[in-house]
Every structure is written in structure tokens, then in C-alpha cells.
């Protein structure tokens, strides 16, 4: 019986991991920090939209990076291997420009 009891508790931990929340720091170019608590399985588009709304800027005017890689709207913290207190960097999107060649 103890084996049966242990097995469901392991499964519960697996389920808990799926719905687990982590805190992420979003740091802007001006070094301002906003902290977000997100589920591991939530699409990061929600975090990006919330950040842009707080900053009063359109979402397409900023780019969000985690460990140097651009974050897509459909990425989740779990897919990117994010952990508690990880940092997302935000930069002004640069458009235009010309070749110097």
C-alpha cells in the first residue's frame, strides 16, 4: 500500500510543476525593474502585453530577450528553461537604418 501512496504523490508533484508559478524580473533599458509572477505554462505574450500596457507603449515597439534570445509570443517559461528570479531584458525595437557599404 505504501507504494501506491507514494506513486500518486509523485504524480501530484509532476502536476504541481506544470502549474507552478515563478517570479520573473523584467528590466528596461533605463534599468527599471518590474516583477511578474507567471505560470510555467503561460505564453509569455501575456507578460509582454502587461509590461507594455504599464509602460504605455505599443508591444511592437519593444523586444524582449532572455539569455540573449528573442522571446516569441508563444514561448512559455518552461520551454525556455526559466527559473525563479530570472531576468528578461527589454530593448527599444530598432527599425529602419541603412547599409554603410
Curated annotation (Swiss-Prot):
Changing residue 97 to A: Abolishes sumoylation of ZBED1. The modification N-acetylserine is found at residue 2. Changing residue 36 to A: Abolishes binding to PIAS2. Residues 20-97 form the Ubiquitin-like domain. One of its GO terms (biological process) is regulation of cardiac muscle cell contraction. The record marks 36 as: Interaction with PIAS2. There is a cross-link at residues 7, 25 (Glycyl lysine isopeptide (Lys-Gly) (interchain with G-Cter in SUMO1)). Keywords: Acetylation, Cell membrane, Chromosomal rearrangement, Cytoplasm, Host-virus interaction, Isopeptide bond, Membrane, Nucleus, Phosphoprotein, Ubl conjugation, Ubl conjugation pathway. Cleavage of precursor form by SENP1 or SENP2 is necessary for function. Polymeric SUMO1 chains undergo polyubiquitination by RNF4. Pfam families: Rad60-SLD (PF11976). GO terms for cellular component: cytosol; glutamatergic synapse; nuclear body; nuclear membrane; nuclear pore; nuclear speck; nuclear stress granule; nucleolus. The modification Phosphoserine is found at residues 2, 9, 32. One of its GO terms (molecular function) is RNA binding. Coiled coil: none annotated. Residues 98-101 form a propeptide. Residues 16-25, 37-40 are annotated as: (Microbial infection) Interaction with Tula hantavirus. There is a cross-link at residue 97 (Glycyl lysine isopeptide (Gly-Lys) (interchain with K-? in acceptor proteins)). It is found in: Nucleus membrane; Nucleus speckle; Cytoplasm; Nucleus, PML body. There is a cross-link at residues 7, 16-17, 23, 37, 39, 45-46 (Glycyl lysine isopeptide (Lys-Gly) (interchain with G-Cter in SUMO2)). The keyword Phosphoprotein applies. Ubiquitin-like protein that can be covalently attached to proteins as a monomer or a lysine-linked polymer. Covalent attachment via an isopeptide bond to its substrates requires prior activation by the E1 complex SAE1-SAE2 and linkage to the E2 enzyme UBE2I, and can be promoted by E3 ligases such as PIAS1-4, RANBP2 or CBX4. This post-translational modification on lysine residues of proteins plays a crucial role in a number of cellular processes such as nuclear transport, DNA replication and repair, mitosis and signal transduction. It is linked to Non-syndromic orofacial cleft 10: A birth defect consisting of cleft lips with or without cleft palate. Cleft lips are associated with cleft palate in two-third of cases. A cleft lip can occur on one or both sides and range in severity from a simple notch in the upper lip to a complete opening in the lip extending into the floor of the nostril and involving the upper gum. Covalently attached to KCNB1; UBE2I increases cross-linking with KCNB1 and PIAS1 decreases cross-links with KCNB1. Interacts with SAE2, RANBP2, PIAS1 and PIAS2. Interacts with PRKN. Covalently attached to a number of proteins such as IKFZ1, PML, RANGAP1, HIPK2, SP100, p53, p73-alpha, MDM2, JUN, DNMT3B and TDG. Also interacts with HIF1A, HIPK2, HIPK3, CHD3, EXOSC9, RAD51 and RAD52. Interacts with USP25 (via ts SIM domain); the interaction weakly sumoylates USP25. Interacts with SIMC1, CASP8AP2, RNF111 and SOBP (via SIM domains). Interacts with BHLHE40/DEC1. Interacts with RWDD3. (Microbial infection) Interacts with Epstein-barr virus BGLF4. Belongs to the ubiquitin family. SUMO subfamily. This is Small ubiquitin-related modifier 1. It comes from Homo sapiens.
Amino acid at each position: 500500500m505504501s507504494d501506491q501512496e507514494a506513486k500518486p504523490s509523485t504524480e501530484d508533484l509532476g502536476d504541481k510543476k506544470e502549474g507552478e508559478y515563478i517570479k520573473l524580473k523584467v528590466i528596461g533599458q533605463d534599468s527599471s525593474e518590474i516583477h511578474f509572477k507567471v505560470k510555467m505554462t503561460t505564453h509569455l505574450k501575456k507578460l509582454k502585453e502587461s509590461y507594455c500596457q504599464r509602460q504605455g507603449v505599443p508591444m511592437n515597439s519593444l523586444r524582449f530577450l532572455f539569455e540573449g534570445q528573442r522571446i516569441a509570443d508563444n514561448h512559455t517559461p518552461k520551454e525556455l528553461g526559466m527559473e525563479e528570479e530570472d531576468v528578461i531584458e527589454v530593448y527599444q525595437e530598432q527599425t529602419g537604418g541603412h547599409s554603410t557599404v
